[in-house]
Regions:
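A short-motif feature that recognizes glycine-rich, charge-decorated loops
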Residues: 1-163
Length: 163
């Protein structure tokens, strides 16, 4: 069955572009949780209470906000075999359409994995519900292994973005 699962590596599991993102909530493995909000110019800014902190680099918030846009799994396994206990971190992407895409980070056999699920609010449009259902249909049963660099992008600590 896992050979058939490998075909998922070639699919666009959660098709999100940077311009689709309204904001991101990040609960990293280390440090406090924080939020990033999209700017009118296409970038991202730290939300209160961290919005007054100086950034380590102008693009730092965008790098932390956009790992889902660069999703490139290197392996796949059944989610039930990887997602055991509490996740290491959580990265919630809020799209402008109203879809919440939740990427939970896991560590198994010295590899970084994520599981992906999507949800909407009760007031969601039919398009948002359709997009969330499509993501869940592709991603829900699976855990996706990532390179260390890609995996760490789903758990960027606040200290890596702002002083």
């Amino acid at each position: 069955p896992l050979q058939r699962a490998m075909r998922w590596l070639d699919l666009d599991i959660a098709p999100v572009k940077a311009g689709d993102i309204a904001g991101v909530d990040i609960r990293p493995a280390q440090g406090p949780s924080y939020r990033l909000d999209a700017n009118a110019d296409g970038g991202f800014s730290l939300a209160p209470p961290y919005d007054k902190r100086p950034l380590v680099a102008a693009l730092a918030p965008a790098v932390a906000a956009e790992p889902l846009t660069r999703l490139s799994p290197v392996d796949v396994a059944r989610a039930m075999d990887v997602a055991v206990g509490a996740p290491v971190a959580e990265h919630i992407t809020r799209t402008k359409l109203g879809v919440f895409i939740v990427a939970r980070s896991w560590r198994k056999d010295d590899r970084g994995w994520i599981t992906i699920s999507a949800a909407t609010t009760d007031a969601a449009t039919p398009d948002a519900v359709s997009q969330a259902n499509a993501i869940n249909a592709k991603a829900a049963p699976w855990a996706f292994a990532l390179t260390e660099l890609d995996w760490s992008g789903f758990s960027t600590p606040l200290a890596a973005i702002a002083d």
